[in-house]
């Protein structure tokens, strides 16, 4: 998954294959910018402050966010510097056209050691996963070999991988190993890269004022099952066919991600459905405001875009919002019970 996605983002325009929320409606980025501004105030207005985005795509979300911040929160705009976590030179070039003031980083660890507000939309789903299969109480780990899935018993995979699966999908001591053997085959996914990111970010947010907002897709609670998928030309595709020509993603384990951040010292809020989060932040009020000044067809398109982001049978329920923050920060906007 890591190599295939690296090749994909280096050679292809991913937005030819799928459309993300910032490309659907400008209101998405605007209200995320306002979320950051209000959260900055809740953190007692630290100066200077980093406004960072992990996996910023074309830079559309940040451009929309900065426009809204400049119009409504000039003191926050003056205090912030923009930082992108991006490993694709192709995407970095597109981001530079949208947000020329940005600074680029290969990882979270290379961000300046300053108070940080981090945004990540559809970032975690692209991080690599490991898959484990359990049959009759025995674990195997799934690999890709010669464009096919193959399995090796846990403990023998060290010949081809530096990261053995002896821990099992529980991540330490084999949490799932203590369960009774299932009556049928079960598949579990382990997201070590996401857990590492959560731990590093959680420690950063615990050490100084800061917050992070993640919008991505996956269940609220940890679950079993195969969530690996490939998207090519806007359609699902075989994840093993033509590596490097499709976007590979997997559902986010929000519960495990939040637990890793809390273990590092951060507070967490959510996850909650994206539709509820965006509605609380004024998605439809802002959309109606924009639609009033448009021709009827354009107004309908704006309203449909908002519905696409928030309706339960579209993106509103599968996609979730999760916030991490400094333990002393009050509840961030949108997460009030």
Predicted regions and their residues:
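Rossmann-like AdoMet
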Residues: 1-116, 132, 276-285, 290, ...
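Glycine-biased, low-complexity coil/linker segments
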Residues: 166-169
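Long, Lys/Arg- and hydrophobic-enriched amphipathic alpha-helices
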Residues: 177, 182-337
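Domain-scale recognition of functional cores that engage charged ligands
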Residues: 113, 133-158, 182-202
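Serine residues within intrinsically disordered or low-complexity segments
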Residues: 161-163
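Charged/polar low-complexity intrinsically disordered segments
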Residues: 157-159, 175-177
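Generic detector of well-ordered alpha-helical packing
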Residues: 54, 87, 123-126, 217
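A mobile, often basic/glycine-rich helix-loop segment
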Residues: 117-156, 225-238
């Amino acid at each position: 998954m890591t190599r295939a996605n690296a090749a994909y983002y280096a050679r292809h325009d991913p937005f030819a294959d799928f459309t993300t929320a910032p490309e659907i409606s400008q209101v998405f980025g605007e209200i995320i910018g306002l979320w950051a501004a209000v959260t900055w105030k809740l953190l007692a207005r630290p100066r200077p402050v980093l406004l960072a985005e992990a996996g910023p795509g074309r830079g559309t979300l940040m451009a929309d966010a900065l426009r809204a911040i400049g119009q409504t929160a000039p003191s926050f705009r003056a205090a912030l510097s923009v930082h992108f976590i991006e490993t694709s030179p192709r995407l970095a070039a597109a981001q530079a056209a949208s947000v020329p003031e940005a600074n680029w980083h290969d990882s979270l660890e290379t961000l300046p050691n300053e108070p940080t507000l981090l945004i990540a939309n559809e970032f975690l789903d692209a991080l690599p996963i490991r898959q484990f299969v359990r049959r009759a109480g025995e674990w195997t780990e799934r690999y890709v070999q010669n464009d096919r899935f193959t399995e090796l018993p846990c403990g023998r995979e060290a010949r081809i991988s530096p990261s053995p699966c002896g821990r099992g999908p529980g991540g330490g001591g084999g949490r799932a190993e203590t369960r009774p053997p299932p009556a049928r085959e079960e598949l579990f996914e382990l997201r070590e890269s996401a857990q590492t990111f959560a731990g590093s970010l959680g420690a950063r947010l615990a050490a100084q004022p800061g917050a992070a907002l993640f919008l991505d897709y996956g269940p609220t609670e940890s679950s079993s099952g195969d969530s690996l998928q490939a998207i090519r030309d806007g359609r699902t595709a075989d994840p093993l066919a033509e590596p490097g020509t499709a976007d590979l993603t997997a559902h986010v384990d929000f519960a495990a991600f939040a637990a890793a951040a809390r273990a590092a010292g951060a507070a967490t809020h959510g996850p909650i459905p994206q539709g509820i989060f965006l509605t609380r932040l004024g998605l439809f009020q802002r959309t109606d405001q924009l639609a009033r000044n448009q021709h009827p067809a354009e107004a309908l398109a704006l309203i449909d875009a908002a519905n696409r982001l928030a309706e339960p049978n579209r993106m509103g329920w599968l996609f979730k919002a999760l916030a991490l923050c400094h333990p002393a920060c009050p509840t961030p906007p949108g997460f009030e019970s």
